Regions:
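Generic alpha-helical secondary structure signal
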Residues: 8, 12, 49-50, 131-135, ...
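Transmembrane and membrane-interface helices of multi-pass
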Residues: 2-250
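Intrinsic-disorder-associated interaction segments
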Residues: 3, 7, 11, 252-259, ...
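Solvent-exposed soluble domains appended to multi-pass membrane proteins
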Residues: 270-650
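Short alpha-helical "patches" and their helix-cap loops
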Residues: 91, 248-258, 370-375, 594-596
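Extended hydrophobic/aromatic-rich secondary-structure runs
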Residues: 139-142, 149-207, 267, 273, ...
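The feature marks either
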Residues: 221-225, 229-290, 298, 334, ...
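Residues that form generic nucleotide/phosphate-binding pockets
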Residues: 58, 62, 139, 162, ...
Length: 650
């Protein structure tokens, strides 16, 4: 009898939790529609389909926000009801009132925030603690009428809570049924609740592969609509997540107390002293180089191709029999191609590679793409503004969505003329991260065909990434042939085969693109091919550090010879810009770079945890060779200082 009463209490409260969830979810979507209507002036050239996409994906991600409140009431009301069956409805209503007040407060605050920053809430909300908090508080009172606004929000929330109270008290079906007391029904209720929780957790999906979250929700071509897809709670969560990343900026090798010594070290390694531009009161002038004179003729097209998870190991001779990278290997072996095996990505994740290519800074876990300094002015080491001085336009092409890691905003802020991505087009196949790579490369070929101006194209692929959803059979992946060549202990590992197939697909797309461009525009192109990072897929359980972490660096084009890069060079992503300048810039051209050109003897590369030089590789554990230690400290300390504090050294 007691258990039956407890079940009835549990079931009663659980039904109200579900009713509360529906109310809050609908309310979140109502707020989103109001935002779309009242803030439409921020939108660009949009159509009905864009608006429907915004509402659809917004509704999905808001399931998570509504689920947060339901989780609280389930734990602190419904489960507690097994022990104390008093005032539970009031407790649920009280928790809901607090949650609704926060929603309403954020909804109003968003209008002011968006007007100021042209974005929904982000990490800058949490950076406010570094400001003069007292002055900030008074500004909010005087300029934004904080006190009066809060009173109005409280009154409005009270009205919403009153409606919620009536809604929760309303019984859809007043009659009880006998089957509700059966064991099968009780088990069914519990199972349904667990399945529903999973469905909400992944935003109207049952797996990560098809989930939606703040990192992949930029589904439209319009920045404003992408921001509105995030409800205000999700935007706050985005800001919190980014801030946590930034807070991890205390990283091995950063010694800001030694900033002068590190600047001087790089000034002596660059041409700053020879050009008499050294200045220890600031950073930029100490990073100047003077080009020795173009090694090859200036090209009409320069392509910097960054393959997602495009590791080096499948391109090595010891793995050639797998034929996973035959297209890129064929490029490497051409007479007019050169490469170095001693090459490291800038970090462990894609944003670090993007940051290195765009702004030329070493990774220190502070994400320059989210730093205020990156949007105040271009860095002296940024690639796009410098290559423009030689007569090139610049375009960034991404197979994903523009809102990912603020990639569009960052690229444009750092000097790129144009940005193109999956959001700009209707594409036939893809996943939560973007379109299949072949589509964006096809669009790029169309752009090249109609563009008569000398242009640098940076291309970032996306398909070789979870959830690994490319139709490999349709693409022609010889799965069974690869399986037969794998070590016996992994031949039945279907997940591994799928990942290897996506590497094969990336290689195929890159190879086909390079071949098509070369055939159509012979002798007019320079290609640089690399990967954003490795350390995702290997066929060994314990691969060597070299096979686990290194990425390729291949330079291909008319005029390139094998001996342009010697066997005694090593580097990483921050050396790419300088290398391109030395290849095509006229003698005497001045450029700014943290990393030295591979053609001028760069000899150190590292990511977040591993270093290499021309003869060895190892973990960053304090036992690095002295030249690695000094170079790493200088690169990282200056990158941290330049991103956080700016150019000047007090």
């Amino acid at each position: 009898m007691i258990l039956q009463l407890k079940w009835e209490s549990f079931y009663y409260n659980l039904k109200r939790d579900f009713k509360l969830f529906i109310f809050v979810w609908l309310y979140l979507n109502l707020l989103r529609v109001i935002s779309l209507i009242t803030m439409k002036s921020y939108a660009g050239d949009i159509n009905l389909n864009d608006i429907l996409l915004t509402i659809y994906y917004g509704a999905r991600i808001s399931l998570k926000t509504a689920g947060v409140l339901m989780l609280f009431t389930f734990i602190f009301v419904t489960l507690i009801g097994w022990l104390i069956n008093k005032h539970l409805d009031k407790l649920r209503l009280g928790l809901s009132a607090v949650f609704l007040f926060i929603l309403n407060f954020l909804f109003v605050a968003k209008y002011f925030y968006y007007r100021e920053f042209h974005t929904n809430f982000n990490e800058m909300v949490f950076n406010a603690v570094n400001d003069d908090v007292k002055a900030l508080f008074y500004t909010m009172i005087e300029q934004y009428h904080l006190l009066e606004g809060t009173v109005i929000i409280i009154l409005f929330t009270a009205m919403v809570v009153y409606i919620l109270k009536k809604y929760l008290a309303w019984q859809w079906i007043k009659k009880s049924f006998k089957f509700e007391k059966s064991l099968i029904f009780k088990i069914s209720v519990i199972v349904f609740t667990l399945v529903f929780a999973l469905f909400v957790r992944f935003g109207a999906s049952f797996s990560y592969a098809k989930s939606i979250h703040w990192e992949n929700c930029a589904k439209t071509k319009d920045t404003f609509l992408n921001e509105i897809i995030l409800d205000d709670m999700q935007a706050i969560y985005r800001g919190y997540s980014i801030k946590k990343r930034i807070d991890n900026g205390v990283i091995y090798g950063v010694h800001k107390e030694n900033i002068i010594q590190n600047v001087e070290f790089l000034a002596k390694n660059s041409d700053a002293y020879r050009l008499q531009k050294q200045d220890l009161s600031q950073i930029d002038s100490n990073l100047v180089y003077q080009a020795h004179g173009n090694i090859i003729d200036k090209k009409q097209h320069i392509f910097i191709i960054i393959g997602e998870s495009f590791a080096q190991w499948p391109l090595l001779d010891e793995y050639a029999n797998l034929q996973l990278g035959e297209n890129v290997r064929a490029i490497m072996q051409k007479d007019n191609a050169t490469y170095t095996h001693n090459f490291m990505p800038n970090g462990a994740f894609t944003p670090m590679a993007v940051n290195a290519i765009i702004c030329g800074l070493s990774d220190v876990n502070i994400y320059p793409n989210h730093q205020y300094e990156s949007y105040k002015q271009v860095y002296a080491t940024s690639f796009a503004p410098q290559i423009k001085k030689i007569g090139y336009k610049t375009q960034f092409w991404y197979a994903g969505f523009s809102g990912w890691e603020r990639i569009k905003d960052f690229a444009l802020a750092q000097g790129f003329d144009e940005f193109h991505c999956a959001s700009d087009y209707q594409y036939p196949s893809g996943n939560v991260w973007g379109c299949d790579d072949e589509f964006i490369f096809d669009k790029l070929k169309q752009e090249v065909a109609q563009n008569d101006e000398p242009t640098v194209y940076v291309i970032l692929s996306v398909s070789n990434h979870a959830p690994y959803s490319v139709d490999l059979a349709k693409a022609g992946f010889p799965k069974e042939e690869v399986r037969a060549k794998l070590p016996a202990d992994v031949q039945n590992n279907e997940d591994l085969l799928n990942k290897l197939g996506h590497y094969w697909y990336t290689d195929k797309v890159i190879g086909n693109f390079v071949e098509d461009i070369e055939t159509t525009y012979p002798k007019e192109n320079l290609f640089v091919i690399t990967g954003d990072h490795a350390d995702r897929t290997n066929i060994e359980a314990k691969p060597t550090l070299f096979n686990r972490y290194t990425v390729p660096c291949i330079i291909y084009g008319d005029g390139i010879t094998k001996n342009i890069l010697s066997d005694e060079v090593a580097g990483g992503h921050i050396n790419i810009g300088a290398t391109i300048f030395e290849l095509i810039a006229p003698q005497g051209f001045e450029y700014y770079s943290l990393g030295k050109s591979l053609t001028r003897g760069a000899n150190v590369g590292f990511n977040d945890s591993v270093w290499l030089n021309t003869v060895d590789i190892g973990k960053l554990d304090g036992n690095e060779p002295i030249e690695v230690e000094k170079t790493l400290e200088a690169y990282r300390t200056i990158s941290w200082w330049r991103s956080i504090k700016g150019n000047l050294i007090p």
